A protein has these predicted regions:
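Acidic/polar, glycine-enriched structural segments that form the non-catalytic walls/loops
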Residues: 1-101, 135, 142-143, 181
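Intrinsically disordered or highly flexible coil/loop and linker segments, enriched in small
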Residues: 5, 15-20, 49-57, 73-81, ...
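Generic detector of well-ordered alpha-helical segments enriched in charged/polar residues
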Residues: 21-26, 34-45, 49, 65, ...
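Active-site core of glycosidic bond-cleaving carbohydrate-active enzymes
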Residues: 97-115, 120-122, 160, 164, ...
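Short, glycine/acidic-rich hinge or "gate" loops at secondary-structure transitions
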Residues: 80, 84-86, 128-135, 143-150, ...
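Carboxylate/His-rich catalytic cores and anion/metal-binding grooves
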Residues: 56-81, 117-136, 154-185, 245
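Tryptophan-centered motif/residue detector
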Residues: 44, 69, 108, 147-149, ...
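Long, structured ligand/cofactor-binding scaffold of large enzymes
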Residues: 89-91, 97-107, 111-112, 118, ...
Length: 335
C-alpha cells in the first residue's frame, strides 16, 4: 500500500544454494536495513580513507572520492563466508588463507590506471587479483593469463596482455605474495601464445593496437626477468619490446596498419583520425602514442623532439573542452 515499505533480505553465493543460505545467516539474517546500510557506509569510509586530500571545493572532493570509489568496485570477492569458491577447473575449492579469490579483471581497462593506483594504496587487493589469475591458470591447466577474466572464464575480450603489466608493476612495488616463479612462467607462456613472435608484429585487423600493446607487455616481462636475474630472458624480451617499430611507416611519418604479407594497408585521406583504421576503439593518431616503455625510441622514430612537440600540440589543441569522445586526445577511452 502507499506509504508502506517492504524489507526483503537475500542471500547469494557463487558456489551453491547451501553457500547462499550460509552467507545469508552469517551476514544479514539478524540485521535490519539501517544496520546493513551503516555497515556498508563504514566499510566504504574506511576504504576511501586510504587517500586523504585537502584543498579544493566540496564538489571537487565529491568528484575525487566518487572516482576513487569506482576504482574499488572490481575485482570483487568471489568466495563464500566459509572460504569456498569455484576455481578455474569449475570445481569447488577452499581458500588456504593466503589470498581471497576475486573475479572480474577487465584487463585492458585497468592495467594502465586502476591497478597501478591500487598497488600503491591497496596492495592486498592486487595480491588477491594476481593470486586469482595465477590459480585460475593453474587449475584450468591453461597455464597462461586471461586478458579479461569474468567468473573464471577465458573471455578473450579486448586486446593485449594486460596481466603482464599488472604482474611486473606489482613485483616492482614489492607485492610478491604469490608463487613468483610460476607467475613469471605463466607470463612467458602468455607472451608466446598471444604476441608478436611470428612476424615481429601482429597483422591486420587492428594491427597497430595489437602490436604496440604486445610490445609494451613484453617490455614488462623483460623488467620482471631482469629483476629475477634471468638475464637472457630479459635481453630477449627487451628486443620483443621494440616490435612497435615494425608498424611505423617512415614515408607517411606515422604508424600504419600492416598485413600478414608485410604490405601496408591502403592509406585513406584521413588515415590518422579514422577510427578503427588498424586500431581498436581509437585511431592511429591516438594509439600511436602508446609506447610508454621506450619514449626516446618513439621520439626518434617520429622525427625528433620538435616534431613530437608539434604533433602533441596539435593533438591537444584540437581536443574539445568538454573532453567527450573525439578524434584527438580522447580522455573518454583507454588508448
Amino acid at each position: 500500500k502507499e506509504g508502506e515499505q517492504v524489507e526483503m533480505k537475500v542471500g547469494i553465493s557463487f558456489v551453491d544454494m547451501e553457500g547462499a543460505a550460509n552467507n545469508f545467516k552469517q551476514e544479514i539474517a539478524s540485521k535490519n536495513f539501517a544496520q546493513v546500510k551503516q555497515e556498508a557506509s563504514d566499510l566504504w569510509n574506511k576504504e576511501l580513507s586510504r587517500i586523504r586530500i585537502s584543498g579544493g571545493t566540496d564538489d571537487e572532493k565529491t568528484v575525487f572520492y566518487t572516482s576513487l570509489y569506482h576504482t574499488m568496485i572490481d575485482p570483487r570477492i568471489y568466495t563464500d563466508v566459509d572460504g569456498r569458491y569455484i576455481g578455474g577447473d569449475k570445481k569447488v575449492h577452499e581458500q588456504d588463507g593466503t589470498f581471497t579469490k576475486r573475479t572480474i579483471f577487465s584487463g585492458w581497462d585497468v592495467f594502465r590506471s586502476q591497478f597501478p593506483l591500487q598497488a600503491m594504496i591497496n596492495p592486498r587487493l592486487v595480491s588477491d587479483a594476481l593470486n586469482s589469475l595465477i590459480t585460475m591458470a593453474d587449475q584450468s591447466r591453461r597455464e597462461y593469463y586471461e586478458r579479461w577474466e569474468l567468473l573464471n572464464s577465458y573471455s578473450g575480450c579486448m586486446i593485449g596482455n594486460p596481466a603482464l603489466s599488472v604482474l611486473a608493476d606489482a613485483y616492482m612495488k614489492g607485492i610478491r605474495t604469490y608463487d613468483v616463479e610460476k607467475a613469471y612462467q605463466y607470463a612467458v607462456n602468455t607472451s608466446a601464445k598471444f604476441g608478436n613472435d611470428s612476424l615481429g608484429y601482429t597483422p591486420e585487423p587492428l594491427s597497430i593496437s595489437y602490436t604496440l600493446e604486445y610490445a609494451y607487455a613484453d617490455w614488462c616481462v623483460a623488467q620482471l626477468a631482469k629483476a629475477l636475474g634471468k638475464e637472457e630472458d630479459a635481453k630477449r624480451f627487451y628486443e620483443k619490446g621494440k616490435a612497435y617499430r615494425n608498424m611505423f611507416d617512415a614515408e607517411k611519418g606515422w604508424f600504419r596498419p600492416r598485413n600478414a604479407d608485410g604490405s601496408w594497408k591502403a592509406w585513406p585521406e584521413n588515415a590518422l583520425t579514422e577510427e578503427w583504421y588498424g586500431c581498436i576503439e581509437s585511431n592511429a593518431y591516438q594509439q600511436g602514442w602508446f609506447v610508454p616503455h621506450d619514449v626516446p625510441g618513439m621520439v626518434e622514430l617520429m622525427g625528433g623532439k620538435e616534431e613530437v612537440i608539434a604533433n602533441l600540440t596539435n593533438l591537444f589543441d584540437h581536443t574539445p573542452s568538454d573532453m567527450l569522445w573525439n578524434d584527438y586526445y580522447n580522455h573518454a577511452n583507454e588508448p
